[in-house]
Every structure is written in C-alpha cells, then in structure tokens.
C-alpha cells in the first residue's frame, strides 16, 4: 500500500513554492508520492479567468519531471463543471482502493474548511494534511495532520503579474516552466 498525498490547485503557473511545499509534506508525512492534481474549475474561484487547462498541465509536467516522487493526476480534468473535493476523492478511492490517500491543503484553505461541500463525509474518506503558513490561523476542530514549510512568499498571481509587466521570474518558477510560458506567450498583457 502506497501513501499518496493529493495536492490540488490551479497551478497557473506552477511555481517553486508549490514544489517546496510538496517536497516538505512528502518527507514530513512519510509519504511515498505526491500527486499534483490540476483543478478544472475550483468552486471557490468560478468567476476567475484561467489559462487553458492544456497549458497548465504541460507546465505542471515540466515543473515536476525532475522528482520521481512527484506524479500528475488528471482526474479533475476528465470532468466538466466545478471540481468538488468530495466527488474527486470518492472517485480516487474507487480507482486506488489499496492506497492510503492524504489531501494536502494550505493554511488559507484550513480557514475555509467549514464551507467545503460534504465536509463531514469527506473527512471519513481521507486524511487532510494542513500546511502551516505565517499570517493564517490554523487551529481547527477537524482532525488534520500538519506540516511546517519554510516561508517562501510567492504566488501564481504574482508570477502572472511579473510576466505581464516584464519583471524577472528567476528562482520563482522552474526554468523549464519559464521557457514554456515565454514560448507560448502566456500571461502577456
């Protein structure tokens, strides 16, 4: 039985903060693999614009290819409409009944947990791992495991803005992702 961390996100674009967080959780929680799972449409972000899913998946492949413990899980890309974690986890549990799944969430999502769709049922299906982050309240009545990750203030929004304003993104995103963004004209004004 493998212990697998599911790391969902828009990854628009994937950045070194995502990779650092995944690597820290991998080792602190004693997991065998981290599966990066790009969202189709997160319910809490339905009114935002996203880069085409094809490009987000390609960038993610480039970002994780150097770590053999990092895999890509596209279950949410197979479905139309909003991506609810409960539906996704139910499907993954059916597909991988012999593996132990953990769902990784950032400190911002810990605060949002009470609003999650079918949360009580979800907590019976999967163990959550909360990633601590400065400035966010991580106390919760829910049974979460926690991981400490070194502070690395970077966000996909900031990186998109840097590309639009032609500011450097060195050391914020993997070089192969940067090259892909530039070659495909993503995030231009």
From Swiss-Prot:
Assembly, per entry: Homodimer.
EC code(s) of this entry: 2.7.7.18
Designated name of the protein: Nicotinate-nucleotide adenylyltransferase
GO MF annotations, alphabetized: ATP binding; nicotinate-nucleotide adenylyltransferase activity
Keyword terms: ATP-binding, NAD, Nucleotide-binding, Nucleotidyltransferase, Pyridine nucleotide biosynthesis, Transferase
Entry-linked InterPro entries: Cyt_trans-like, NadD/NMNAT, Rossmann-like_a/b/a_fold
Role noted for this protein: Catalyzes the reversible adenylation of nicotinate mononucleotide (NaMN) to nicotinic acid adenine dinucleotide (NaAD).
Entry's Gene Ontology BP terms: NAD biosynthetic process
Family: Belongs to the NadD family.
EC top class, as a word: transferase
Stored CDD domains: NMNAT
Pathway annotation from the record: Cofactor biosynthesis; NAD(+) biosynthesis; deamido-NAD(+) from nicotinate D-ribonucleotide: step 1/1
Gene that specifies this protein: nadD
Catalytic reaction(s) noted: nicotinate beta-D-ribonucleotide + ATP + H(+) = deamido-NAD(+) + diphosphate
UniProt cross-references to Gene3D superfamilies, sorted A to Z: HUPs (3.40.50.620)
């Amino acid at each position: 039985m493998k212990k697998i961390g599911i790391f969902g996100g828009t990854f628009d674009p994937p950045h070194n903060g995502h990779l650092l967080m995944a690597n820290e959780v991998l080792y602190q929680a004693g997991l065998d693999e981290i599966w990066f799972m790009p969202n189709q449409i997160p319910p809490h972000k339905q009114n935002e614009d996203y880069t085409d899913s094809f490009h987000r998946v390609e960038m993610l492949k480039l970002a994780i290819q150097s770590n053999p413990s990092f895999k890509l899980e596209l279950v949410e890309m197979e479905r139309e409409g909003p991506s609810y974690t409960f539906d996704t986890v139910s499907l993954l549990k059916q597909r991988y009944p012999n593996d132990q799944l953990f769902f990784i969430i950032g400190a911002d999502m810990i605060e949002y947990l009470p609003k999650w769709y079918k949360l009580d049922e979800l907590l019976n299906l999967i163990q959550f791992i909360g990633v601590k982050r400065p400035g966010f309240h991580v106390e919760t009545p829910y049974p979460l495991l926690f991981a400490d990750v070194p502070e690395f203030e970077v966000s996909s929004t900031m990186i998109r803005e840097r590309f639009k304003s032609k500011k450097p993104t060195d050391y914020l995103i993997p070089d192969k992702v940067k090259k892909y963004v530039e070659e495909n004209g993503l995030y231009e004004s």
